[in-house]
């Protein structure tokens, strides 16, 4: 079948960007244009010959525009197979004219529900019915019909029509049809999520639909032989997008591994939003140093001293604008990425001298609500994000000795961090500084040994420190190892059948211990 020449177009758009120029070009190629509502008024006002869709249907737009294109003469004109004799006969008998081009974009439902003060009624009125119906009909018959949903495709269609005798190519029609089904799928996903939330549906539900749209292409994944990309995601709690939260100000493109580390570093620094100056240093998604201090530079020095080797090539996040003193200290070593809510005067210029370093501006907080998804060979695991916190007054003191105010401050500091570290996790903290990080071990005792060893490597004295465990101590041995290191207070979930043994061991060593009642495994 030859590529059909476009003779008749149906145009109805919410986003009117470029539509006047596009239709003016169509008219110059003798394309007959039919339109609706505001689009029709705009085109006619611009001096373009365009007719109301009612001239095709013989039926007026009714019910405040809810019904205008849902008509057999529209969908028959879109769906008719042009070289099918029966279809041609049905079209003649019913006065149906073929429609060769559909230009439609949909009511802005997502933009509408993103408004803080949107009402349910307003959201409902922005659910497009006729638009998706026309798009799907046109896309189904892509052998004969060209369908355009994206302003960015106007130029391609016009160029092909000019060079192809008024027709588009089969390859282009098929590509545009694929975009239609991706669009309508995402559109319906957003509506379904909004309706479920409005209905008060709790939990993940029996079915879930994710809306994913590529935001960034990447050279490769975790390793060079793996392909990768970053996708915007709408899981029903709003769109999660890198560019909405971050802006890369300097350096080469961010890699897949960079993105994982940025997520890890900012996830921890978010715990200290609004608190005194805090710094997080991350390597391979685990923190190798976290600290708070009266100044940002002091906080950085403390975080760095936790592990003076791992920060090389690492990622550093700050909860304050990066000042010149701190930037100069950071500049003493090579770091992959620096993330800050702002950069003070002169700092960017100084840091940009190292071309291999990326500088990232965090424009807004990370979203906390929502779901976490992990792909497996046998399906998708879905869980709520681990975002629940414990206030000091919710802690249960289970030992004879109460923690001091200083110990309590360190315990709360440690508990904010421990859930961001791979399990099993043992974390030593002193004076709002990580002193030893034991991460990702199969044995909790081994995690404790590693944390103690890391502290000894940089001559950090664990006497007077506190320890946090992401899960309960199954035996007293882990706690006794901490006591031997000089720990004075412990924070852990509790819940072991041997809790009493652990509590007795704590009392025997004059330790203060609190239970949170909340485990923080991270696999």
Swiss-Prot record:
PROSITE patterns on file: MGS
GO biological process: 'de novo' IMP biosynthetic process
Record-level Gene Ontology MF annotations: IMP cyclohydrolase activity; phosphoribosylaminoimidazolecarboxamide formyltransferase activity
Keyword Transferase attributed: yes
Domain annotation MGS-like: ranges: 1-149
Pathway listed: Purine metabolism; IMP biosynthesis via de novo pathway; 5-formamido-1-(5-phospho-D-ribosyl)imidazole-4-carboxamide from 5-amino-1-(5-phospho-D-ribosyl)imidazole-4-carboxamide (10-formyl THF route): step 1/1; Purine metabolism; IMP biosynthesis via de novo pathway; IMP from 5-formamido-1-(5-phospho-D-ribosyl)imidazole-4-carboxamide: step 1/1
Domain of life: Bacteria
GO CC field: cytosol
EC code: 2.1.2.3, 3.5.4.10
Reaction(s) catalysed by this chain's protein: (6R)-10-formyltetrahydrofolate + 5-amino-1-(5-phospho-beta-D-ribosyl)imidazole-4-carboxamide = 5-formamido-1-(5-phospho-D-ribosyl)imidazole-4-carboxamide + (6S)-5,6,7,8-tetrahydrofolate; IMP + H2O = 5-formamido-1-(5-phospho-D-ribosyl)imidazole-4-carboxamide
Coiled-coil stretches: none
Swiss-Prot/TrEMBL keywords: Hydrolase, Multifunctional enzyme, Purine biosynthesis, Transferase
Domain commentary: The IMP cyclohydrolase activity resides in the N-terminal region.
HAMAP family found in the cross-reference section: PurH (MF_00139)
NCBIfam families in UniProt: PRK00881.1, purH
Family: Belongs to the PurH family.
Protein name: Bifunctional purine biosynthesis protein PurH
Gene source species: Chlorobaculum tepidum (strain ATCC 49652 / DSM 12025 / NBRC 103806 / TLS) (Chlorobium tepidum)
């Amino acid at each position: 079948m030859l590529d059909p020449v476009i003779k008749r177009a149906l145009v109805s758009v919410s986003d009117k960007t470029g539509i006047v120029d596009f239709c003016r070009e169509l008219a110059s190629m003798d394309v007959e244009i039919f339109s609706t509502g505001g689009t029709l008024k705009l085109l006619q006002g611009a001096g373009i010959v365009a007719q109301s869709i009612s001239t095709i249907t013989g039926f007026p737009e009714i019910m405040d525009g809810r019904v205008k294109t849902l008509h057999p003469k529209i969908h028959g004109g879109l769906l008719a197979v042009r070289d099918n004799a029966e279809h041609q006969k049905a079209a003649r008998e019913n006065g149906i004219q073929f429609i060769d081009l559909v230009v439609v974009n949909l009511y802005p439902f997502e933009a509408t529900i993103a408004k803080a003060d949107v009402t349910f009624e307003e959201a409902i009125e922005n659910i497009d019915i006729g638009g998706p119906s026309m798009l799907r009909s046109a896309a189904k018959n892509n052998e004969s019909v060209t369908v355009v949903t994206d302003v960015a495709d106007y130029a391609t269609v016009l160029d092909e029509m000019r060079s192809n005798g008024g027709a588009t190519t089969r390859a282009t029609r098929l590509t545009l049809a694929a975009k239609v089904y991706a669009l309508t799928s995402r559109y319906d996903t957003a509506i379904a999520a909004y309706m479920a939330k409005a209905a008060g549906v709790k939990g993940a539900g029996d079915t879930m639909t994710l809306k994913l749209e590529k935001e960034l292409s990447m050279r490769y994944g975790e390793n060079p032989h793996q392909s990768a990309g970053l996708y915007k995601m709408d899981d029903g709690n709003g769109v999660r997008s890198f560019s909405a939260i971050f802006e890369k100000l300097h350096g080469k493109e961010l890699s897949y591994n960079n993105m994982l580390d940025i997520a890890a570093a900012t996830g921890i620094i978010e715990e200290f939003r609004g608190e005194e100056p805090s710094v997080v240093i991350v390597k391979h998604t685990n923190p190798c140093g976290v600290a708070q201090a009266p100044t940002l530079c002091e906080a950085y020095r403390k975080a760095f001293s936790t592990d003076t080797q791992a920060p090389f090539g690492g990622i550093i996040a700050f909860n304050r604008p990066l000042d010149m003193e701190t930037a100069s200290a950071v500049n003493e070593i090579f770091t992959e990425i620096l993330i800050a809510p702002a950069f003070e005067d002169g700092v960017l210029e100084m840091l940009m001298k190292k071309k291999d370093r990326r500088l990232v501006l965090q424009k807004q907080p990370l979203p906390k609500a929502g779901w976490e998804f992990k792909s497996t060979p046998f399906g998708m695991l879905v869980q709520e994000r681990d975002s629940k916190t414990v206030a000091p007054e919710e802690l249960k003191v289970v030992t004879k000795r109460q923690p001091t105010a200083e110990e309590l401050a360190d315990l709360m500091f440690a508990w904010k961090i421990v859930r961001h570290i791979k399990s099993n996790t043992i974390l030593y903290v002193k004076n709002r500084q990580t002193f030893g990080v034991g991460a990702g071990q199969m044995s909790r005792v081994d995690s404790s040994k590693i944390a103690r060893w890391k502290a000894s490597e940089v001559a950090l004295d664990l006497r007077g420190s506190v320890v946090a465990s992401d899960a309960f101590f199954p035996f007293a041995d882990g706690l006794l190892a901490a006591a031997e290191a000089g720990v004075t207070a412990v924070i852990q979930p509790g819940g072991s059948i041997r809790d009493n043994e652990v509590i007795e061991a704590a009392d025997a060593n004059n330790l203060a211990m609190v239970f949170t009642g909340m485990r923080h495994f991270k696999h």
